[in-house]
Amino acid sequence: MTSASADRTTRAALSRNRNFTLLWSSKLTSDCGFSAASIALPLLVLAVNGSAADTGFVLGTVATAQLAAGVPAGALADRWNRKLIMLGCEAAQAIAGASLLAAILLHALTIAQVVVVAAAFGVCAAMFDPAEDAALPTVVPDEQVPKAVAMNAARASLAHLSGTGAGGFLFAIGRVVPFAADMVSHAAAFTGLLFLRIPPREAAAQPPGQLHREMLEGLRWVWQQRTIRVTALCAVVLNLFFSAFYIVVIVLAHRRGVPAGQIGLMAAMLGAGGVVGALLAPYLQTKLSPFISIASVFWALTALTPVALVIRNGYLMGALFFGIALLPPTANTTITSRQLLNTPDHLRGRLTGVVGLAAGIAGAVGPMLGGTLTQLISGSQAVLVCAAGMAAITVVVTASPTLRRFPRHEPTESSEPPVAALKP
């Protein structure tokens, strides 16, 4: 945070930070609606024409749009007014939800419209995140950024947990209900963000260039930062194999006759573990070194994933998922807070866009890998393949001198270090 930003920001507890509270609560409201709509969209497609192919296409559209817009969104967050970007995203999602609501009520819904709405949801999600992340260090003091990052992680897990549970329930009440709730949630978030005050950014030294050049500049800068590069690559590999493992476990549980209700509980426990882990993250971050907080996630997943081979009860698997989800928020808090505080303000949006793209690729390829493994080999063998992949990257993380020297951030008057300090 610049000294000017610090002068504008109170150093009271985050709960009494007006701007952070507005940003956090608005995004929570928005994310709950988005999660509910994300569950309701495939159910709506199935209700319209019963096509599993169309259902998969709609879900793929959300993910594809989010991936495709990620890097451009980061560049735009460094170029445009970040508050206006967030407001525009909420307004667009409210309008998209309203269009579905109207089409359902008028019996005029088409799959093409659902695809367009899904694309709008994906693009808006990609646009909002870099703008919010880049603005975060300007609305909270440097020393509170780690706690703010942890609270944002808890918010995401809580919204996913509550929204996905509510989506199916609301759709059972009526087809229009989840989309009405989604529209209201985005309208409420838009209203809250209207009152958000973000300190003005310093004038750019040079006028904005061509967008594609700014995107390449962001990619180049992120790649040149050794710590960011190593942590991102290791996280991508781990997320890829865990996403595959998650699908494998769901399929394995189904083959073993685990009731659908217990399988749903397994997924819910993963989200619940994420919420609890995010709440514990600020405390754990003060007790663990950065390297231990990061490496412990890899060690824990490597040790716990093979346990799935001997579990045949959905409740016990849910407990395993809960335990697996406890430590990642601490590592994410350590990594994200340092990245934000040590990245120049004019590059923070592109940082988030690039890192989000990498995470999105892992999240998209991982389930496909898991599904392919369950088709080619037995479920138990697929678990072992995923565990082996996690073990391999764990060895790399444990031996990495870059991660072993991962520095603990010490807040300074300015979070924008000199250019020389940004070079690896």
Language model regions located:
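Alpha-helical transmembrane-bundle signature of multi-pass membrane transport and export proteins
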Residues: 1-424
